[in-house]
Amino acid sequence: MASSRLVTTAFWLSIVLGVLGEMRLEAQSTCPNPPNYELLRQDEDYSYLRDDACRRDPWDSLKYVRLGSRGDSFLTIGGEMREWYEGFRNAIWGVGPQDGNGYLLQRLSVYGDFHVKRRIRFFAQLTSAVEAGRNGGPRPVIDESKLFFVQAFADITAAEGKENSMVMRLGRQEFYFGSGRLVDPREGVNVRLAFDGIALIWKKAQWDVRAFAAKPVLNGTGFFDASPDPGKTFWGVYAVRPLPKIKGGNIDLYYLGLDRKQAVFDKGVGRELRHTVGT
């Protein structure tokens, strides 16, 4: 009799544990995978961490800091560090100063992404880029800028939805269009390229369209001495749509305009006004 009760109890216990296990798996399946680390960190979306059941990593507490009882306002905190060693032999065919030991390029960034409900967003990314050990010191523009805001912008969302959204972005921002062959944040060097200006981001069905007008940021080597370049203006429209019949393929349509007041040519210095249309 006792053994019969034991078997019955074990049977119902296994049923309960199985149901609880299924419920747990179902809850986990509703949580999306964490986003990949993007070249532009503002493209990472951690809003899914609003659901406490989706928090699986100790760092998730920094990726979603709840502000307010409703949870539709939150702060994301992140950062990255890059150490890059370069060494050359017979640089420029041995002409000029040579460096037999190489040099170190170090870049450290921290950022904060503040979402005020669904319509307003503030994003700021503070960066320190320094060079150590290079014969002749850091190269201008690309090697060193001790402390500066590489990005500091506000987003205003005019329309929101999976099939149709419109965002206006104001402030300092990085651009990365299409595959990055024409316009990218210049990740290869130590000091990345940013722009001060305005951008409109429109997503309709499978189209991603971005219109912008901005000035490139000219970095100094010190602290907070980055400012827009008064001699250059950059504007345009860039549209991207995936091609479903080609795996990983896209179609890009773009117009880019560039005005340089003091462009350097072989025969002198003058204004350059360039218009580029392509696909």
Listing of model-derived features with the role each one plays in the protein:
Residues 21-100, 111, 117, 139-141:
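N-terminal periplasmic/intermembrane-space "pro-region" immediately following the signal or transit peptide
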Residues 87-106, 116-166, 181-184, 222, ...:
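Surface-exposed loop and membrane-interface regions of Gram-negative outer-membrane beta-barrel proteins
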Residues 162-168, 181-279:
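Signature for the C-terminal beta-barrel architecture of outer-membrane proteins
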